[in-house]
C-alpha cells in the first residue's frame, strides 16, 4: 500500500509573464518515467525548460530530478521535495517553463516549480494504491439474497456473476478483509472461495 496518483494530468499558471505547466503521472518503472519525460520534451520542445522529478518503487529506491538549465537547485529538487513530503511512490512530476522576459530569482523559481509539482499531483488525482484479491464466491441460491444485501451494505462492487446449479460472484477483496469470515458464518461455511489473482488497484478513502 502506498501513496500515488490515478493516471496523469496537467495544470498551468503564469508568474511574471512566464508560463508554467505542471504535470503529474503514474509510472511503474524508471523506463516508463524516462519515456514520459521524452514525450513531454517533444510536446513542449519550444519551451525554455522542461524540468522533472520522480520517485520509483514502494521503497523509494529510485529518486531522480533535473533542473534542465534552470539555476542549480531551483527546479528539480523542490519538485522532488513535494513528492517526498506527500510520501508519493511511482510518480513523475514535470515543470515546463516558457520564459516571459522577467527573471524570477532563486526564491521565485523555487516557489514556481513547487507549485508545478503540486498542480501536477492535483491534476493526476492523488490515490492510495492497494493490493486486492480477485475472489470468486460460489454458494447455494438460498443464500443469494442475504449475500447481495451484505455486499450492498458494505460497498462491494460485483465484477462478474454466474448462475448455474449454484450462484457465483467475483469481487475485489482486500487481504484479511472481514467478508471472508462473514460469508462463511452466513452460509454455515457452505461457500467455496477461490482467489483468482492479486491486483494492485487505486483507492480513494479506502474505496475502489
State where each predicted segment sits.
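Terminal, non-globular segments
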Residues: 169-178
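Active-site beta-strand/loop microenvironment that shapes enzyme catalytic pockets
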Residues: 75-123
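Short glycine-/aliphatic-rich beta-strand segments at the starts of folded cytosolic domains
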Residues: 126-142
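Short amphipathic alpha-helix segments
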Residues: 138-156, 178, 182
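N-terminal positively charged helical leader segments and presequences
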Residues: 163-167
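Structural motif
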Residues: 23, 52, 90-93, 134
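C-terminal regulatory domains involved in ligand/effector binding and gene-expression control
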Residues: 1-74, 186, 194-208
Amino acid at each position: 500500500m502506498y501513496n500515488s496518483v490515478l493516471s496523469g494530468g496537467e495544470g498551468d499558471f503564469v508568474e511574471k509573464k512566464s508560463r508554467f505547466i505542471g504535470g503529474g503521472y503514474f509510472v511503474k518503472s524508471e523506463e516508463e518515467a524516462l519515456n514520459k519525460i521524452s514525450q513531454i520534451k517533444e510536446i513542449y520542445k519550444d519551451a525554455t525548460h522542461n524540468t522533472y522529478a520522480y520517485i520509483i518503487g514502494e521503497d523509494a529506491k529510485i529518486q531522480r530530478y533535473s533542473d534542465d538549465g534552470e539555476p542549480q537547485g531551483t527546479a528539480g529538487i523542490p519538485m522532488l521535495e513535494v513528492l517526498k513530503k506527500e510520501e508519493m511512490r511511482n510518480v513523475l512530476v514535470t515543470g515546463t517553463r516558457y520564459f516571459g522576459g522577467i527573471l524570477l530569482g532563486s526564491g521565485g523559481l523555487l516557489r514556481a516549480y513547487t507549485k508545478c509539482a503540486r498542480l501536477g499531483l492535483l491534476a493526476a488525482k492523488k490515490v492510495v494504491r492497494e493490493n486486492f484479491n480477485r475472489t470468486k464466491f460460489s454458494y447455494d441460491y438460498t443464500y443469494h439474497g442475504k449475500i447481495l444485501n451484505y455486499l450492498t451494505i458494505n460497498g462491494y462492487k460485483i465484477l462478474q456473476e454466474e448462475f448455474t446449479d449454484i450462484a457465483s460472484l467475483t469481487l475485489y477483496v482486500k487481504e484479511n478483509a472481514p467478508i471472508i469470515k462473514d460469508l462463511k458464518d452466513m452460509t454455515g461455511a457452505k461457500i467455496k472461495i477461490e482467489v483468482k489473482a492479486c491486483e494492485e488497484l487505486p483507492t480513494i478513502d479506502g474505496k475502489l
